[in-house]
């Protein structure tokens, strides 16, 4: 969901929406650096005076105006808070067995768009991917980036967290609260007839 607004020429345009992990407050300045600044200034080619929407995961959207564009930074003025897309009252943690490459990315993307509150990757018996150390840290950063991008595109103002992977039996031994669900083709209870509390953990294979 991309909001609409007026350009500096009075033409209706799509307003770009970006994540920024800084405090945002109406009447205060904001600054984008690095990849965000490059994407906004060089890829999207916004100009001074253009409108942009920022969010930082606090559940709010913020209407901003571009004040200055430099090679590595973009300065903005935070004007006001905007109504954000409401979050689901059902808090779902997706417990996903780590899968290869694009399959894991697709799971994170689509579950974020559908309203998942958090992700807990797990190592199960059939998992083919095993990561440790710096490789695992880079993969976690990549996964979190996939989630952020899905929030930018879907209009969510709360960013689900991606936790560090644990072994499946370790997760199963932890007290998580709420209800734990495992989808099974031969189960006698269907999702349509089930009642859930406010917190659910959904385990997905392989």
Predicted regions and their residues:
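A glycine-rich beta-strand to alpha-helix segment
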Residues: 194-206
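Short glycine/serine/threonine-biased micro-segments
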Residues: 47, 57, 99, 153, ...
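Structural motif
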Residues: 16-17, 29-30, 51-52, 74-75, ...
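N-terminal positively charged helical leader segments and presequences
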Residues: 1-83, 134
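Solvent-exposed alpha-helices and their adjacent loops that cap or buttress functional pockets
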Residues: 24, 44, 86-87, 173-175, ...
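A short acidic, often aromatic-flanked loop/helix-cap motif at beta-alpha or helix-coil junctions
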Residues: 24-26, 166-172, 188-190
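RNA substrate-binding interface of SAM-dependent RNA methyltransferases
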Residues: 79, 84-182
């Amino acid at each position: 969901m991309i909001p609409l607004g007026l350009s500096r020429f009075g033409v209706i345009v799509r307003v770009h929406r970006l994540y920024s992990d800084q405090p945002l407050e109406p009447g205060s300045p904001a600054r984008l650096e690095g990849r965000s600044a490059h994407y906004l200034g060089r890829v999207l080619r916004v100009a001074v005076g253009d409108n942009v929407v920022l969010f930082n995961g606090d559940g709010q959207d913020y209407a901003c105006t571009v004040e200055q564009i430099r090679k590595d930074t973009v300065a903005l003025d935070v004007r006001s808070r905007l109504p954000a897309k409401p979050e689901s009252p059902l808090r779902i943690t997706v417990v996903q067995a780590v899968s290869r490459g694009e399959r894991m990315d697709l799971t994170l993307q689509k579950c974020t768009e559908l309203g998942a509150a958090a992700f807990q990757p797990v190592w199960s018996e059939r998992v083919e991917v095993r990561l440790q150390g710096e490789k695992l840290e880079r993969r976690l950063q990549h996964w979190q980036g996939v989630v952020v991008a899905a929030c930018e595109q879907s209009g969510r103002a709360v960013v689900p967290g991606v936790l560090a992977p644990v072994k499946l039996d370790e997760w199963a031994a932890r007290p998580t609260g709420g209800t734990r669900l495992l989808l099974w083709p031969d189960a006698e209870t269907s999702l349509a007839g089930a009642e859930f509390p406010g917190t659910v953990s959904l385990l997905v294979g392989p």
